[in-house]
């Protein structure tokens, strides 16, 4: 199963180019805004495309899903196809330009945005009256775009979602005078406790172990883009102040010295080795750690993510050019109803359903009293208000640029404001290429 994440630089460039070219017929906008008649008996066939999900683990689930739908609607056929993990955005680009986009298609928000810009995805708000009550709000928001009809449309049913939970090494924290049952809740509290750990250990132990990124900028109270979604605009005083706090902490020795260079192993790796006392990860991190490092797993306690949690989401979209839109819409709703979503994430450990009704399911709302049980419930609660921080037009090249500029600021080569100005200006230039 493919992890929910941004697409590669090449793939991102492909979908941005697709949106920029406005590929599609002259009636694409009208197609996306149409209302699909749903009163007639369903019949005929459609194609349903997933992304890197045809394997021993998930194939039985999808085989049954399709069979159940066809049994409930005699005379219908759902042809399930799956695309490999690599090159998916490029494949979707090819499908749009050739007019062969599947009727129901698995898309993350960034690729969905590019396809929606061409008018090739159906607006679900006009076709599903219960959309806002049937699905998790945070997931729906990820498929609304400010630069398409002012953000009034929605182009994906939230399907399987993820978020981050904070994890703490209680043994390491206790040694340095901190209590993992009273962890930081905000970035400022994190810095304060990082100082305590640093001072108590003589600079040998670390609570913080990563440089700031987009999520930190958003959590500083900064909007990443203009209200119309057409330009980056995160070079604010608030964002600069946040980077300055990281810089001060870095210079004081609260972060590992290699956090800004190629020798940096990553926050999670350092945590698993017992070299830092805090990391973030999905709701199943303790269980996954137990498989590789049982001793470490017993030292971990979870808590909600600092400030606002990030959202990772995959969804199902409906082609506005489908020749059997009624069947496509019905199947997409069936595949993402509460029963089928819960069944799917029971196989996809660490992910959460995008159905609103899952909030009433004890497996997501009640802990069994173990740290892992607590983490699972925390993840589900965090997901409700989580935010997809990454704009759909943000590419790997832009992220590399941000990291380089932040590193310059944290090492005193330029001010935080200069770093943000440079990043915003160059990222906006990349948008027009």
For each predicted feature, which ranges?
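Extracytoplasmic/periplasmic substrate-binding proteins
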Residues: 51, 243-330
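Hinge/lid segment of periplasmic solute-binding proteins
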Residues: 109-163, 297, 381
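Short, low-complexity disordered leader/linker segments with a strong preference
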Residues: 1-47, 71, 428-433
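C-terminal capping/gating helix-and-loop segments adjacent to ligand/active sites or protein-protein/ligand interfaces
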Residues: 374-423
